[in-house]
């Protein structure tokens, strides 16, 4: 490979990294109610199955987008946290030492029928691997916020309700896209 081509590739990579860093900082976090993981754990009785948990962004490659998870019918955190884990289910207290803030969201008008279908959709994802995809509706492998988006969307389709949690309609769905959805309310624990 010639020197000219190597230099252009380096510039392109630097441009892409800087663009991604800028994009991940475009949503203000201060318009939401945030809690420490310990506050969430100590107020777990106020959480409901079907609640969406969003972790705040951090200035690292792995966490610069935030993170999304949902509570199943047993109020356990279900998520797609990484390539090595794929689907993961853990008690709420498993997040007690995470050094990030947590925002809690609930689908407006959620009822028992919707929750029942939602939990079936969650259970159908157990064997799917983690993976980044370039289209949010591709469900052969999933990343955290795509998982949340798809289980709510499919539950909505099966209950006759349109539930599109992607607030900006892009090809990907990120945690902060979900947070901005008009279909959700940010839950206060106090």
Regions found by a protein language model. Give the residues of each.
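A structural motif
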Residues: 77, 108-127
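Glycine-rich catalytic cores of cysteine/serine-nucleophile enzymes that process amide/ester linkages
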Residues: 47-108, 130-139
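Sec-exported extracytoplasmic/periplasmic mature domains
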Residues: 82, 123-127, 149-157
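Extracytoplasmic/periplasmic, Sec-exported soluble proteins
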Residues: 39-45, 57-63, 110-117, 135-144, ...
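Solvent-exposed, polar/charged alpha-helical surfaces in well-ordered, non-transmembrane soluble domains
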Residues: 45-51, 116, 120, 124, ...
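Protein maturation boundaries and topogenic segments
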Residues: 1-48
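Activation targets extended, charge/polar-rich intrinsically disordered C-terminal tails
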Residues: 25-32, 134-190
């Amino acid at each position: 490979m010639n020197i000219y081509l190597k230099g252009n590739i380096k510039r392109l990579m630097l441009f892409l990294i800087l663009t991604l860093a800028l994009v991940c900082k475009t949503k203000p976090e201060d318009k939401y109610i945030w809690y420490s993981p310990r506050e969430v754990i100590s107020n777990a009785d106020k959480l409901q199955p079907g609640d969406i948990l969003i972790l705040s962004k951090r200035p690292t490659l792995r966490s610069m987008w935030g993170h999304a998870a949902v509570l199943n019918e047993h109020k356990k955190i279900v998520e797609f946290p990484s390539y090595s884990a794929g689907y993961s289910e853990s008690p709420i207290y498993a997040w007690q030492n995470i050094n990030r803030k947590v925002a809690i969201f609930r689908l407006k008008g959620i009822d028992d029928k919707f929750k029942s279908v939602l939990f079936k959709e969650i259970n159908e994802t157990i064997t799917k691997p983690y993976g980044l995809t370039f289209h949010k509706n591709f469900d052969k492998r999933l990343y955290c916020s795509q998982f949340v988006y798809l289980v709510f969307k499919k539950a909505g389709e099966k209950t006759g309700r349109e539930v599109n949690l992607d607030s900006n309609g892009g090809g990907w769905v990120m945690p902060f896209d979900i947070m901005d959805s008009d279909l959700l309310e940010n839950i206060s624990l106090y």
